Amino acid sequence: MALPTPSDSTLPAEARGRGRRRRLVWTPSQSEALRACFERNPYPGIATRERLAQAIGIPEPRVQIWFQNERSRQLRQHRRESRPWPGRRGPPEGRRKRTAVTGSQTALLLRAFEKDRFPGIAAREELARETGLPESRIQIWFQNRRARHPGQGGRAPAQAGGLCSAAPGGGHPAPSWVAFAHTGAWGTGLPAPHVPCAPGALPQGAFVSQAARAAPALQPSQAAPAEGVSQPAPARGDFAYAAPAPPDGALSHPQAPRWPPHPGKSREDRDPQRDGLPGPCAVAQPGPAQAGPQGQGVLAPPTSQGSPWWGWGRGPQVAGAAWEPQAGEAPPPQPAPPDASARQGQMQGIPAPSQALQEPAPWSALPCGLLLDELLASPEFLQQAQPLLETEAPGELEASEEAASLEAPLSEEEYRALLEEL
């Protein structure tokens, strides 16, 4: 019987194909002697193995390996057949004496292990001549060393990496996912498609150019971390935000639908003072933005034809969605009734917003929701919007209150008497 050896599938790529020990072919008489000894004791000691090796003409280390492999085969067979393994039979026999390895021999073995963790038969025989140890003991020493220190030694098994397994210079791999980019009249905030990429696969200016095309009004302090590393999106998804995007030719998001103007407010009724308030909430379509004062990027209203302008900080309402008040937020202004045309002149006399509201620099880095809440909760805004919240004229309110105070409600008896008369 041939000496069983580890299959090529269980060995690393560096260990396969090297010089290995010659396959040992067992004769029928040798196999019968080994099996007879195995039936008596599956765990023979060193003395029994040496006598058996001398009787069949085989080195004792090969006899020991045969017994190890035969025990493994029998154990697997018993497990498949759900039979208990008998284990040791009889008193335990003496074991091999521990091989003493000196410091100089250990240094030679360690030096060879650092060069190659899986030495072939020729390298082991050369080490046996240099150290004076048996080749079989050197083989066992390398097996034990690999088991105790799996990460040490040279020529380690190569690990198959993905497209983005490593970065240039031994650093961390570049992110294979691209970031959010607002597109259309009102950015949808949908993530771009997942494109696994190797370092250096994209051009150097791809990230910066795409980020500038997605949101050209980013300030230098905000656009700096957008090169090569994606940043988390703000809490509110309607804020202009740029991050690494796919190169030219990649999949792009569809344009957002164009919404009709508000039904209760025509273009002439809108207040130019209020609509002209600057704010960081409005996101225009990708295109050149008008630069604001002092060289800072400020988003401008979209100039494309057919795209209605809703004013800074305003967006189209989804059809069928009901308004839900938030904490600290005033209700939206209702359309003025026909008989309240006299109050339109009063609205024209509202003073322009203060200088603090016209400065976009302190607010440009804040989310849209916080700016809107702060604006709606200000006393000046509430005082100006109070006339719009009244749905009836003051005279009509006074008349209805007087009529209600003069007419007393009917009692239950009067109500029944009235029903009987009818």
From Swiss-Prot:
Residues 1-10 have a biased composition (Polar residues). One of its GO terms (molecular function) is RNA polymerase II transcription regulatory region sequence-specific DNA binding. GO terms for cellular component: chromatin; nucleus. The keyword Nucleus applies. Residues 19-78, 94-153 bind DNA. InterPro entries: HD, Homeobox_regulator, Homeodomain-like_sf, HTH_motif. One of its GO terms (biological process) is regulation of transcription by RNA polymerase II. Residues 265-274 have a biased composition (Basic and acidic residues). The gene is DUX4L4. Residues 278-302, 319-329 have a biased composition (Low complexity). Gene3D superfamilies: Homeodomain-like. It comes from Homo sapiens (Human). Disulfide bonds: none annotated. Keywords: DNA-binding, Homeobox, Nucleus, Repeat, Transcription, Transcription regulation. This is Double homeobox protein 4-like protein 4. Residues 1-24, 72-102, 148-167, 218-361, 386-412 are annotated as: Disordered. It is found in: Nucleus. May be involved in transcriptional regulation. The keyword Nucleus applies. Its main location: nucleus.
